[in-house]
């Protein structure tokens, strides 16, 4: 049985982690997640993605038992680099990815969620990076992404103390963008938002994601030039013609990604 299942309905893909009891992010999980992303990226029938954990947790972190098999600095650094590459791929993915968080998103689980474009969390979920409690540090880019969402001082407090925060606190801090009362509502809200994304032109969604994260590689001026270029490309697309025509005809547009 695969550790990650992939189901697609109405242009929305749901990736579900099946690794009880805590949905730990083992090497196998990371490999299967990468494989699922390969499928989603090339499938025109997928326009938005939800990542969710089966059972009690989104993901309670890395596979600690697997750590005992690492042999020295080289093995551990390689594990971190592989994890970082996957998280970067998720953040750079051309289709929006939503993390649907319930139970706990700790350690590598939170690093996975932070790499997603949007985080929706149950108010009683626990989110944190407790690696320092084990005498190690976050290795899947947690030290880089958390400060972007909550600021450097708050990131130091959260990582340095090793204490988790609730989904409600994470929403107040801006780490989570949408709150929910429980797991059922998390999934409901995630599917509703993913469906809205799926109604849009795939090309414009890809351009939007590229532009929102362009400051990682471009200056402000460079990002503006890229925006102007992508605007011109979008304006000439068949989807733009359809969108404008649908507006004039007072109907819902049917975008085809052309």
Curated annotation (Swiss-Prot):
GO terms for biological process: fatty acid beta-oxidation. InterPro entries: ClpP/crotonase-like_dom_sf, Enoyl-CoA_hyd/isom_CS, Enoyl-CoA_hydra/iso. It catalyses: a (3S)-3-hydroxyacyl-CoA = a (2E)-enoyl-CoA + H2O; a 4-saturated-(3S)-3-hydroxyacyl-CoA = a (3E)-enoyl-CoA + H2O. Signal peptide: none annotated. It is an enzyme of class 4 (lyase). Pathway: Lipid metabolism; fatty acid beta-oxidation. It comes from the Bacteria. Induction: Repressed by FadR in the absence of LCFAs (fatty acids of 14-20 carbon atoms). When LCFAs are present in the medium, they are converted to long-chain acyl-CoAs, which antagonize FadR as to its binding to fadR boxes on target DNA and thus derepress transcription. The keyword Lyase applies. Its EC number is 4.2.1.17. NCBIfam families: PRK07658.1. Belongs to the enoyl-CoA hydratase/isomerase family. Involved in the degradation of long-chain fatty acids. This is Probable enoyl-CoA hydratase.
């Amino acid at each position: 049985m695969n550790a990650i299942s992939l189901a697609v309905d109405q242009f929305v893909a749901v990736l579900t982690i099946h690794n009880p009891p805590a949905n730990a992010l083992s090497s196998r999980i990371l490999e299967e997640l990468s494989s699922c992303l390969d499928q989603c990226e090339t499938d025109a029938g997928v326009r938005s993605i939800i990542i969710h954990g089966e059972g009690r947790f989104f993901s309670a972190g890395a596979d600690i038992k697997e750590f005992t098999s690492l042999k020295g600095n080289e093995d551990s650094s390689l594990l971190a680099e592989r994890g970082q590459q996957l998280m970067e791929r998720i953040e750079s993915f051309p289709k929006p990815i939503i993390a649907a968080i319930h139970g706990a998103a700790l350690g590598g689980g939170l690093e996975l969620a932070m790499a997603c474009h949007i985080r929706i969390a149950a108010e009683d979920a626990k989110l944190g990076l407790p690696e320092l409690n084990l005498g190690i540090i976050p290795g899947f880019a947690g030290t880089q992404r958390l400060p972007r969402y909550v600021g450097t001082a708050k990131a130091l407090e959260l990582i340095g103390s090793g204490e988790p925060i609730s989904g409600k606190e994470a929403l107040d801090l801006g780490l989570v963008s949408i709150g929910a009362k429980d797991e059922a509502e998390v999934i409901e809200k995630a599917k509703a938002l993913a469906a809205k994304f799926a109604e849009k032109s795939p090309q414009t969604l890809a351009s939007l994601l590229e532009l929102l994260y362009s400051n990682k590689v471009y200056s402000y001026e460079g990002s503006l030039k890229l925006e102007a270029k992508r605007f011109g490309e979008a304006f000439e697309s068949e989807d733009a013609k359809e969108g404008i025509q649908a507006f004039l005809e007072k109907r819902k547009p049917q975008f085809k990604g052309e």
